[in-house]
């Protein structure tokens, strides 16, 4: 039954904690997103270089495996796709400035917030698609 609705948007989830990543992915898949998962900012950067313009949403933790953090990744993501919805999460106060248009969510966040953001992003995605046609 999960295939009854067409996938309308793609989200990139960047989280080195496998359980957190899986939970976010499940929430977004239930909201009709196609999901790309990455454990590190470096892996996500490759996805952004190849598919950045086709993404609608990126959610990343600040502290990630590898050399780059989520805030640095957010800046790269916005350069690749200025219209991309970007959410940066952390259990600690943010020490770096986010790019324009990016949002910061303090951990722990509520799963319902992910669903609401997904729904808002889908509406924006549909509006942009309608304007192109």
Report residues per predicted region.
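Active-site residues of response regulator receiver
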Residues: 61-62
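Two-component/phosphorelay signaling modules centered on CheY-like receiver
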Residues: 18-37
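A Lys-centered signature of the CheY-like receiver
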Residues: 107
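Short amphipathic alpha-helix used as the core "switch/output" element in two-component signaling
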Residues: 45, 71-83
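Acidic, metal-coordinating helix/loop segments flanking the phosphotransfer/catalytic sites
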Residues: 37-57
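Non-catalytic signal-transmission and effector/linker regions of two-component phosphorelay proteins
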Residues: 1-12, 18-19, 25, 54, ...
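Acidic catalytic/metal-coordinating carboxylates
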Residues: 40, 68-73
């Amino acid at each position: 039954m999960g295939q009854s609705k067409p996938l309308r948007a793609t989200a990139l989830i960047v989280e080195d904690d496998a359980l957190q990543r899986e939970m976010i992915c499940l929430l977004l898949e239930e909201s009709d997103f196609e999901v790309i998962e990455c454990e590190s900012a470096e892996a996500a950067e490759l996805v952004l270089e190849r598919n950045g313009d086709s993404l609608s949403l990126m959610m990343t933790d600040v502290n990630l495996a590898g050399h780059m953090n989520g805030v640095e990744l957010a800046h790269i993501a916005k350069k690749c796709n200025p219209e991309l919805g970007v959410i940066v999460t952390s259990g600690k106060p943010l020490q770096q400035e986010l790019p324009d248009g990016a949002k910061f969510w303090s951990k722990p966040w509520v799963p319902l917030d992910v669903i609401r953001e997904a729904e808002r992003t889908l509406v924006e995605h549909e509006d942009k698609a309608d304007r192109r046609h």
